Design a protein with these regions (language model features):
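C-terminal auxiliary extensions adjacent to catalytic cores
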Residues: 1-156
């Protein structure tokens, strides 16, 4: 389910970049001169694919242990580690979607959204400023992912 949520988030993010719905392509005013949010979408696509591979069941490959007394081992510890990685990747995927959403709202101003969306937008803007020109934005993704990990969006 976590891997699928990441896939859905990536597809929603992609829709924001297409240049439809009255938003500029790549969520930048000068997409010919700037890459906008092209690279973070590559990142989410890679993380989504990684999550799909991590969801292959570890129990599909069992090996006898304990001098043959344990003929089928669940590989539960491996599954737990893989799931932890999927969740970390999902946090980054969702962070990119939130970053794209905040940028998209910039092009809708002065219109306002619901108080919940505005609160989320304001929280994001405490960590990440609007993208005007190309810059390194990996730290922006990590800052929003940290907000997710800290459950800051739950109080909105």
């Amino acid at each position: 389910a976590a891997a699928e949520l990441g896939n859905i988030s990536d597809r929603r993010s992609y829709l924001l970049l297409e240049g439809k719905f009255g938003l500029p392509r790549l969520l930048t005013e000068s997409s010919g001169l700037n890459s906008g949010f092209m690279i973070p979408q590559y990142t989410t696509a890679a993380l989504v694919t990684e999550n799909k591979t991590l969801c292959f069941p570890a129990s599909a490959d069992s090996i006898p242990t304990s001098l043959g007394q344990e003929d089928h081992v669940s590989m539960g510890s491996i599954s737990g580690r893989k799931f932890n990685q999927v969740l970390g990747n999902l946090e980054n995927i969702l962070a990119v979607e939130l970053m794209f959403g905040a940028q998209g709202l910039e092009f809708r101003r002065p219109a306002k959204c619901s108080k919940y969306v505005e609160n989320a937008y304001n929280l994001i803007r405490t960590k990440v400023e609007k993208l005007e020109d190309d810059r390194l934005i990996g730290e922006d993704m990590l800052a929003i992912a940290e907000l997710i990990r800290e459950r800051k969006f739950e109080v909105i």
